[in-house]
Curated annotation (Swiss-Prot):
Catalyzes the attachment of tyrosine to tRNA(Tyr) in a two-step reaction: tyrosine is first activated by ATP to form Tyr-AMP and then transferred to the acceptor end of tRNA(Tyr). This is Tyrosine--tRNA ligase. Its main location: cytoplasm. GO terms for cellular component: cytosol. It is an enzyme of class 6 (ligase). The keyword Isomerase does not apply. The keyword Magnesium does not apply. InterPro entries: aa-tRNA-synth_I_CS, aa-tRNA-synth_Ic, Rossmann-like_a/b/a_fold, S4_RNA-bd_sf, SYY-like_C, Tyr-tRNA-ligase, Tyr-tRNA-ligase_bac-type, Tyr-tRNA-ligase_bac_1. A motif ('HIGH' region) lies at residues 37-46. ATP binds at K235. It holds the Pfam family SYY_C-terminal.
Length: 430
């Protein structure tokens, strides 16, 4: 199966310029994807383009990841409604280094093979290019009429937009077009890929190559990923789902994929994993037979978490999930680091308790009625303790008068109380 066929069955092609498939079948081809370096981590919205590059390299072709150091200083107006913050060079260089480390989990940069991946930064060829030379050499080839016809420009200049568009952002498509021309000349790059919102910018590049060099270059875009309910993919109430554990813990990352709908899981497993058609068909059959077991979501969450983080992080995330949603032990709870513990119990009631009072020792029954409103009365707590329905840190509480002190704390700060099977409370010593 060639690259285009692979993307087709995965639902990853929106538009493709005529001649693209023939070019790829003819010879080893270099293709690039542009990556916005405005943060020092990729988020899952970037993953579609990254997976395209991964499939491209697996098909024997040469992937190029272009970090938009120069264009990132401006901001792409495509489908955006406001001007972007501009970044300084030191920040962009730091972001580039972080992004390359993440990309190395998907692409082989170190191989001696002719299709080894390469990372480039357009700031390296734009920083010495004077404005006068640029508008003389490049600007003369693309008319304002051509640039105004792009959907992203029309949208920002429409009456509905109160923001308007600066000359800086208007010039963005010329800069991206020049990137393609530069890579065509210096890296033999014949294909640019991206999301459907990039079609206008990509075709500006193919047009520039045609007009300046008489060369043939191609374009391929993937659909913008949406959710079945029409919501925005990759966003939660707390913001983006990042690939860097500093911003999104492996547990939260795993939970995001585990909780997608059946319809989304069937779509995402083709786009965000390397699983074959046969493997996915088998999972779909399992899902149809026993949807309550959610085999698609579980496999999707496993594959993406292992790919982005590690097998160990995936296993820890599963174990952490079992603490809240299944049967787990005191030992499993002790293994959780503080970030994962807080992520797991983010949605349960929290109570602050005095560290000094706890250090002196407090009876469990007083702690759960007077210091934290877990039980409305001591009598009710006694009744549930007698039937084995109360646990502290996943250990059954045998007596309501058991004295709790600082030695019971997790990470010297937290105490987890469970009332019945499903009610959890997190006490925080302060």
């Amino acid at each position: 199966m060639n690259f285009v066929e692979e993307l087709r069955w995965r639902g990853m092609i929106a538009d493709m310029m005529p001649g693209t498939e023939e070019q790829l079948q003819k010879e080893l081809t270099s293709a690039y994807v542009g990556i916005d370096p405005t943060a020092d981590s990729l988020h899952i919205g970037h993953l579609v383009s990254v997976m395209m590059l991964k499939h491209f390299q697996r098909a024997g072709h040469r992937p190029i990841a272009l970090v938009g150091g120069a264009t990132g200083m401006i901001g792409d107006p495509s489908m955006k409604s406001a001007e972007r913050n501009l970044l300084d060079e030191a920040t962009l260089r730091h972001n580039q280094d972080c992004i390359k480390k993440q990309l190395a989990k998907f692409l082989d940069f170190d191989s001696d093979a002719p299709n080894a991946a390469k990372l480039v930064n357009n700031y390296d060829w734009m920083k010495g290019y004077s404005f006068l030379n640029f508008i003389r050499d490049i600007g003369k080839h693309i008319t304002v009429n051509y640039m105004m016809a792009k959907d992203s420009v029309k949208k920002r200049l429409s009456r509905e937009s109160s923001v308007g568009m600066s000359f800086t952002e208007f010039s963005y498509q010329l800069l991206q077009g020049y990137d393609y021309l530069y890579l065509y000349e210096h890296e033999g790059c014949r294909l640019q890929m991206g999301g459907t919102d990039q079609w206008g910018n990509i075709t500006t590049g193919t047009e520039l190559i045609r007009r300046t060099l008489g060369g043939e270059a191609y374009a391929l875009t993937c659909p913008l990923i949406t959710k079945a309910d029409g919501g925005k993919f990759g966003k939660t109430e707390s913001g983006n789902i990042w690939l860097d554990r500093r911003y999104t813990s492996p547990y939260k990352f795993y939970q995001f994929w585990l909780n997608v709908s059946d319809a989304d899981a069937a779509k995402y497993i083709k786009i965000f994993t390397d699983l074959s058609q046969e493997e996915i068909a088998a999972l779909e059959a399992e899902q149809e037979a026993a949807p309550h077991l959610r085999p698609l979501q579980k496999r999707l969450a496993k594959e993406v978490t292992v790919m982005v983080h590690s097998l160990e992080d995936y296993e820890a995330a599963v174990e952490a999930s079992n603490i809240l949603f299944g049967n787990s032990t005191h030992e499993a709870l002790l293994k959780l680091d503080e970030d994962t513990l807080l992520a797991v119990f983010e949605g349960v009631p929290h109570f602050d308790i005095s560290r000094d009072e706890l250090a002196a020792g407090i009876k469990a029954v007083d702690l759960c009625t007077e210091k934290a409103a877990i039980f409305p009365s001591k009598g009710e707590m006694r009744k549930l303790v007698q039937s084995g329905g109360v646990s502290f840190n996943k250990e059954k509480l045998a007596e309501v008068d058991t004295v709790i002190d600082c030695s019971s704390l997790l990470d010297d700060k937290y105490l987890l109380v469970q009332r019945g099977k499903k009610n959890y409370y997190l006490l925080i010593a302060k």
